[in-house]
Amino acid sequence: MKQKIIAASLLGALMLTGCSTAETTLESSSDTTQAILVPSDSVVTTESSESETEATTEATTEITDPDMSDVPVEQLGALLIVGDTAYEYYNFVLKTADKYITTVNRAGEVLKGKADVYAMIIPTSMDITLPASVRDTITNVSDQKKAIDYMYSSINGVKKIELFDVLKSHRNEYIYYRNDHHWTSLGAWYAYQQFAALRGNGSASLENDFTKVEYDGFRGTFYNDSQKNPALNNPDTVVAYKPNCTNHIDIIQANGEPLDWSIITNVSDWRADSKYNTFIGGDNPWSVIKNPNKNDGSACLIIKDSFGNAFTPFLVPDYQYVYVLDFRYYKKISSDKLSAVVAKNNIKDVIICTNISATRNSGLIDALSEFCQ
């Protein structure tokens, strides 16, 4: 892929700031004081060839931001609470971002001629759904689009799934939860459409291939992290799409025990903070979904953090086998690396699916790097 990168000012500013080791938990960032900010005046552009097309979807309607003049805004640690919605701060960390780049490039090299590798960095809600009138007043966070552009611009031999502009064009829709850090199924569906367009062989239809279910009363990570702030006491609804071809998933748990489970589980009676676990049984080292309507040997592997949970069900109609690997926990059950997993299972598509906060967490990227060999 031929690329043009106007990044001297970006890297210069990054190096002057220094490389922070500010860490996050498994998913959410909690330290915003020492991480590196991507300067707002930096420019990173890319050009794509036919062999490495970056799929995009154009907005079909003009999107306007709501009037936020009377909406209360409160900063609470690493969270910004705006009305009844919380947003997570993100800060770019150069050293960790560069290791992510190296890791993804190595995955492409290891699987060259054997499988297609896709990189998917998922932005968080702050730079997507937070109205510009509020977002523009926040100076101690990084520009997620520029951070993603920086990482994608240095990835070669891997297909990059562009999500930022697409999600931004749908920002007035219910694509992120209000009181949890994850995206919703609708946000994940728009990501699936981008992947399918890039792959050139996706055919799933939301109306024909899935059954919609809803589970009310979800109070997620932001609600808990805010010490149950009253402003967030407005539960989300978890909307899920159950594949019509099968709702069965075979899971290997972290203790090595197998579990027959559902791709979409009825969580109506589950605890309020557990309802995101409707998707693929939550976070497990290894899972396999077999589509009984396919007999062509097609197989994909999704290497994911928890954002991949809501995305995975949309892959099911397109493949005979969908293999799900959580890179944070896989080594608990196996010492196999990426090349061995792909060879053993005749996998032809590999999706590396991470939310952007993971790309600033050295522990998570170390785990991803350890596997991608």
Which residues does each PLM region occupy?
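Extracellular glycan-modifying ectodomains
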Residues: 14, 19-373
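Sec-dependent bacterial lipoprotein signal peptides
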Residues: 1-17
